[in-house]
Every structure is written in structure tokens, then in C-alpha cells.
């Protein structure tokens, strides 16, 4: 259950001026309808995203809608890999006003395992700021080593830690502090370039 909660958080806060109203919802699957909520003063667009959690042979998809900032709309695809058998990825789309009523939801392309020759330390700690690291093979656009440490949890969550390969887009999103959760909790995020895999 805690693992699924972590995965939800990964997706739920993948999207964060003017005061506009955006639909808010999170559902398993692809059809998401919810309530209207006024966005924050720095949020000037609505964001819909589809997130997939893959751990062969299982794959879980959920869709969410929330407020966001237009300067992150071009960062429409992100992925992370904290474990050689686990992949987290998301596709995002922005809209405003009536456009949100007709804009088709983002759709993730079929996942293809594509090792890119890079590696990072990876692990997940669901109840601690520390976790036991091991080397993870990066895939596709994952060229960064991402570390997330949740020190001061909110929403009644325990401490958490996450390390693994990540796409540069995901690191740029964190750099822009797009994640609403960062505003209410003490979260350390660090990205460094992934390193070439050593020959065995």
C-alpha cells in the first residue's frame, strides 16, 4: 500500500500569474473527472497527465488533472527508474479555458526497454531518509541520477527516500519547483549526470 501511495505521489505532483480554475482529480485508468479549484497566483495553466508504473509483468496506469505553470508545458514526458525491474513514467499536457473540454488526454507510447549504457545508484526507502543503494541500468532518455529525500512529511506520510535514473525533463521540473508538495514539506532534490556503465 505504501508503495502504491509513493507511486501516486510521483504522478500527483508532476504538474503544478493569473487566478484560473482547473479541474482536479486522480483516478486509476484513463478517464478523470473531478471538481474545479482556483489555482495559485503563480499557476497559469491546467495540466492533465497520464502516469504509468511498470513492474513486469504488471503495469498500473492512472490519470490526474491539476493546476500548473506554462513554463513547464514543454517538459511533457518524464521517466525515472529506481530499480532494474521498476519504471515510473508520465506524459503531460497543458490547456486553459474551453480548450480543456476538448483536449484529448495525453497518451503514453508503449514502453520499450532501451538500456542506454548509463547507470546510477538506485533505491526506495518508504519509511526512511536512507535506503540501501545498488546500481541501476538507465534506459531511454534517463541521463540523470535523481535523489529525493522527504524529511518533513505532510499528509500524514512517513519519511521517504528515492534514488535512481531519471530523464533530464524530470530534473528540470523539480528545478522549477513545479511540485506543490515541495511547498508544504521539507524535500531535498538533487540531480547529477549519470555515469557510463562499467564493463563486467
Swiss-Prot record:
Cysteine disulfide links: 22-46, 25-32, 39-67, 73-94, 95-100, 120-145, 138-165, 171-191
The keyword Disulfide bond is annotated on this UniProt entry: yes
UniProt keyword terms in alphabetical order: Disulfide bond, Phospholipase A2 inhibitor, Secreted, Signal
Record-linked CDD domains: TFP_LU_ECD_PINLYP_rpt2 (cd23572), TFP_LU_ECD_PLIGB (cd23630)
Range of residues in the leader sequence: 1-19
Compartments (UniProt record): Secreted
Gene Ontology CC terms, in alphabetical order: extracellular region
Molecular-function GO terms, alphabetical: phospholipase A2 inhibitor activity
Signal listed as a keyword: yes
Pfam families: PLA2_inh, UPAR_LY6
Superkingdom, natural source: Eukaryota
Note: Concentration of this protein in the serum is 8-fold lower than in the E.quadrivirgata (another non-venomous snake) serum. This difference may reflect the difference in the food habits of these snakes. E.quadrivirgata preys upon snakes including the venomous snakes, whereas E.climacophora only preys upon small mammals and birds.
Assembly notes: Heteromer composed of subunit A and subunit B.
Function: Inhibits the enzymatic activity of the phospholipase A2 (PLA2).
Recorded family membership: Belongs to the CNF-like-inhibitor family.
Name of the featured protein: Phospholipase A2 inhibitor gamma subunit B
Amino acid at each position: 500500500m505504501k508503495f502504491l501511495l509513493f507511486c501516486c505521489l510521483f504522478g500527483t505532483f508532476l504538474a503544478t500569474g493569473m487566478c484560473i480554475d482547473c479541474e482536479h482529480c486522480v483516478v486509476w485508468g484513463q478517464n478523470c473527472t473531478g471538481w474545479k479549484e482556483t489555482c495559485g497566483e503563480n499557476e497559469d495553466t491546467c495540466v492533465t497527465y497520464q502516469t504509468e508504473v511498470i513492474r513486469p509483468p504488471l503495469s498500473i496506469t492512472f490519470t490526474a488533472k491539476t493546476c500548473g505553470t506554462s513554463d513547464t508545458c514543454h517538459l511533457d514526458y518524464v521517466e525515472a527508474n529506481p530499480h532494474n525491474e521498476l519504471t515510473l513514467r508520465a506524459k503531460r499536457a497543458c490547456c486553459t479555458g474551453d480548450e480543456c473540454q476538448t483536449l484529448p488526454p495525453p497518451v503514453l507510447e508503449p514502453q520499450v526497454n532501451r538500456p542506454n549504457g548509463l547507470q546510477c545508484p538506485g533505491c526506495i526507502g518508504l519509511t526512511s531518509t536512507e535506503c540501501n543503494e545498488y546500481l541501476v541500468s538507465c534506459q531511454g532518455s534517463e541521463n540523470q541520477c535523481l535523489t529525493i529525500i522527504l524529511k518533513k512529511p505532510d499528509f500524514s506520510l512517513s519519511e521517504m527516500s528515492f534514488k535512481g535514473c531519471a530523464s533530464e525533463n524530470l530534473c528540470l521540473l523539480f528545478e522549477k519547483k513545479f511540485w506543490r508538495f515541495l511547498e508544504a514539506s521539507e524535500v531535498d532534490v538533487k540531480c547529477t549526470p549519470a555515469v557510463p556503465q562499467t564493463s563486467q
